[in-house]
């Protein structure tokens, strides 16, 4: 299975206009059986996206984040049980670098993953290093620690957990990491998971656009893309979808 996941972040879009631009420009792309195209709007727009995309033959709905807590006195948070009330939500991003900077630890990301699996929602677990970590030569150790908490997770093998490798220092800059650097990290992640007999699809995220996506997707161990800024334009996102 291949994956193309849009993270709209804290942006509010004209959903009808976005869907129209996407579907008018996507041409012949793979079906849902081989390519899952998942759109993650902000929480308030999720119901509207579900409604407007109901008749789309390509688009699925996801969430940008979830709480590690069960429903209760946690102001401003959304639980996995709340997400599961929308049967159309099949995926949820956790551990995005912007959430990690806001305080999500590896332990919290693991807890969020568990909550999602309990509700049969597939977690898209983000891992990745900062520019400082990359330049210090500590990238592999840093990635290992992010993956370490999942090593004894018995449900990992029987549930659809997706890993998204994001080069934090490239996010939002318009400049993607060099292919050789992406390859090294993806191969390391795959090898690390393999030592635990864990198989997971691995995506790449970090200033992905229609121009660079084809070259990135040519890498054998990359099963898809997590797209930020370029996903806000339905036409641009359609061009990325055509590269699968």
PLM region descriptions:
Residues 1-244:
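Active-site loop-to-helix "anion-binding N-cap" substructures in soluble metabolic enzymes
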């Amino acid at each position: 299975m291949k994956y193309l996941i849009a993270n709209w972040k804290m942006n509010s879009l004209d959903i009808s206009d976005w869907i129209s631009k996407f579907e008018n420009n996507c041409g012949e792309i793979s079906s849902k059986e081989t390519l899952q195209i998942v759109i993650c709007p902000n929480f308030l727009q999720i119901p509207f996206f579900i409604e407007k995309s109901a008749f789309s033959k390509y688009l699925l709905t996801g969430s940008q984040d979830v709480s590690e807590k069960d429903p209760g006195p946690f102001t401003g948070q959304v639980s996995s049980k709340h997400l599961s009330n929308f049967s159309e939500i099949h995926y949820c991003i956790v551990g995005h670098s912007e959430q990690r900077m806001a305080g999500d630890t590896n332990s919290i990301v693991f807890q969020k993953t568990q909550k999602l699996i309990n509700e049969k929602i597939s977690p898209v677990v983000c891992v990745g290093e900062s520019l400082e970590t990359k330049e210090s030569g500590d990238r592999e150790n840093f990635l290992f620690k992010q993956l370490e908490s999942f090593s004894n997770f018995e449900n990992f093998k029987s549930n659809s957990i997706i890993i998204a490798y994001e080069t934090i220092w490239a996010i939002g800059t318009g400049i993607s990491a060099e292919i050789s650097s992406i390859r090294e990290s993806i191969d390391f992640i795959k090898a690390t998971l393999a030592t635990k007999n864990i198989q997971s699809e691995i995506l790449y995220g970090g200033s992905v656009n229609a121009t660079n996506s084809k070259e990135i997707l040519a890498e054998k161990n990359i099963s898809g893309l997590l797209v930020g800024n370029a996903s806000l334009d339905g036409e641009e996102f359609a061009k990325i979808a055509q590269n699968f």
